[in-house]
Amino acid sequence: MTAQTKAKFQASMIPLIAIMTALTTVLTMLVKLPTPTRGYLNLSDAMIFFSAYAFGPWVGGVIGGLGPALSDLLSGYPQWAAFTFVIDGLQAVLVGLIVRKFRPANMIAGSVIAGVWKVFGYFIAGGILSGWGPALGEVAGNAGQMAVGLIIAYALFAAVRKAYPPLVRMGNLGVQPTVTIPEDDAAASNQQTGVSDETATAKPDTPAGAGH
């Protein structure tokens, strides 16, 4: 990838990150179940997992961290925003790094490992903000939120991967484009190597009786 191509690719990522961050924020705010630690359960995991599957660890990490953190700020939970950015962002990074193949077992295992980190991270954050008792009581709820998000994300990613492959080519699980060599380039290559089109495409004569 040339420097110019790389710069164009990076510039094209900005609108994508902005759109996906906005979608993640909205979905996180759409369903909110208040918890004893003055936080709330939500559907952010679905977009965190999807972003990591589709766009890889680093872009997914930015989306996964910013979207839920903005939801905290807009929903009246500013004390959680910094914790959310770090915990959810690292969750997406872990998923993007661990999950390498589009296979249910691989995706579930990697996502569960990242989900365990999230449950642990929110337990620590909840203990700091509201005490260890209430934080311990939310472990089951956070685990359930992770499981629901994983199911939604897997179904959504599988559908998008099939319907519109270019959207998910940046991640490890995307459908990679097929590389074809234009005829003009192939002809030029043959000329450089001294091979004519006829020679390149001709099949050698098979002597009579030489077949198997």
Question: Predicted segment positions?
Answer:
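Loop-helix junctions at membrane interfaces
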Residues: 1-212
